[in-house]
Design a protein with these regions (language model features):
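Active-site and adjacent substrate-binding regions of carbohydrate-active enzymes
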Residues: 2-9, 14-19, 23-38, 42-428
């Protein structure tokens, strides 16, 4: 969505408007505003929510600020994410704080009272890092810099502190699998076969390796290998040609990515959505997805986070069937959360057919998970209309019937005891 600096894209809505990109000040609603699936409400600092009297009965006692450098406002609660309401935000399309035509951290901080009024528990930020934006920011050119359209590191720090003061946590997308071809690591890696960072990426003289790995973007890529004329070799990429995969068999890469996590967690982030984690490793004779080595590295990431940054969360983005995704919980020692992609289309199927069978079927096929883990459910997010996890027949049905009536989602609500994720501006 293109931001109009003359429009208020983040103010509190009129009573009947659920969208996160609307205008107006929050009037006292006629009745209590309750978000389905809400966790116990957070203490409100600065001003009272319109529905505060209703939420007060479920609110824990006043939370004490933990005396650390991040200035957090939460008691220790390692399972906070299990009932939290997450709200996805694309910075560019949310609110323009400096009048340059692009949403930014200044604008997001300005609208925190609106987000607090909605009753959310955690903001999930889409990619905010320095990037040439060939793939919406999922092509990162500097893991420790903010895209200049969105602001500065100081702006991020100020926003996180302001969110924490309102009892709102913040997580962000982190792409671990690959970088932009503009990243200095890759620029150095491709400069010479003798480069110190040559082994930071997956290079080969033979483009027939890993032939059993599927091509994800078949409409734009004909191979998972691209030829680099600089050194006369092929580099591996599971996504676009301008997103070379990091080589996690190289210990220096593992250390570098752990350093990236520490950088942002030290800044105050409450966790990450780990993008494209099924593809971290490659092995001949496999489809190069969901490999044991990927799980071992994620366990190392989790152990690092638990030891150094308690109460943070790792959310796995693995667009796979539940039997495969459940592996990303490990024994409660890998990711805290994972998306349940197959539920989303079946929710809409059930509403259109006016029967619960599609939802019940996929839930029956969903394995149990450790007690300290949680599925993340969503009706829509930036991966909306993701119909990979349905049959051909179901896909044809969804193409013809998908969300004709927007009231369907209001009828369903979010009634499972799972962590709901909302997306600003997508519920009109």
């Amino acid at each position: 969505m293109t931001v109009n600096p003359d429009e208020d894209h983040g103010s509190a809505p009129q009573q009947s408007a659920p969208s996160g990109a609307v205008s107006g000040s929050p009037p006292p609603p006629a009745g209590p505003a309750v978000v389905a699936g809400r966790a116990p409400a957070k203490p409100v600092r600065g001003r009272e929510r319109p529905h505060q009297s209703v939420a007060a009965a479920r609110r824990p006692t006043q939370l004490a600020a933990r005396p650390d450098s991040r200035g957090q406002w939460f008691e220790s609660n390692p399972l906070w994410f299990k009932t939290a309401v997450f709200y996805e935000i694309h910075l560019r399309g949310f609110f323009d704080g400096n009048g340059d035509g692009s949403g930014d951290f200044l604008g997001l901080e300005e609208k925190l009272d609106y987000l607090d009024w909605l009753g959310i528990d955690c903001i999930w930020l889409l990619p905010m890092f320095a990037s040439p934006l060939r793939d919406g920011g999922y092509d990162i050119s500097d893991f420790k810099a903010v895209h200049p359209d969105y602001g500065t590191i100081d702006d991020v720090r100020s926003f996180i502190d302001a969110a924490h003061q309102r009892g709102i946590r913040v997580i962000a997308d982190l792409v671990m699998n690959h970088t932009s071809s503009d990243h200095p690591w890759f620029v150095e890696s491709r400069s010479s076969r003798d480069s110190p960072k040559r082994n930071w990426y997956v290079w080969s003289d033979d483009s027939s390796r890993y032939s059993e790995a599927r091509i994800i973007f078949v409409d734009s890529e004909t191979s998972n290998w691209s030829y680099d004329e600089e050194t006369g070799a092929y580099y591996w990429h599971r996504f676009f040609y301008h997103q070379p995969d990091l080589n996690y068999d190289e210990p220096e890469v593992q250390e570098a990515m752990l350093d990236v996590l520490r950088f942002w967690l030290d800044l105050g982030l409450d966790g990450f959505r780990l993008d494209a984690v099924p593809y971290l490793y490659e092995r001949e004779g496999t489809n190069c997805e969901n490999l044991p080595e990927s799980h071992e590295f994620l366990k190392r990431v989790r152990a690092t986070v638990d030891a150094e940054y308690p109460d943070r969360v790792l959310l796995a983005e693995a667009n796979q069937w539940p039997d495969d995704v459940v592996q990303y919980f490990g024994d409660g020692d890998e990711c805290h959360m994972a998306f349940h992609f197959p539920v989303m289309p079946r929710m809409f199927m059930s509403l259109r057919r006016e029967e619960a069978a599609p939802i019940l079927e996929i839930l029956d096929r969903t394995p149990g998970i450790p007690d300290n883990c949680q599925w993340g459910l969503f009706l829509r997010n930036h991966d909306e209309l993701t119909l990979e996890m349905v049959t051909d027949e179901e896909r044809d049905y969804m193409y013809s019937e998908y969300a004709k009536d927007p009231r369907m989602k209001l009828n369903l609500g979010i009634r499972r005891r799972l962590a709901p994720l909302l997306d600003n501006g997508r519920d009109e």
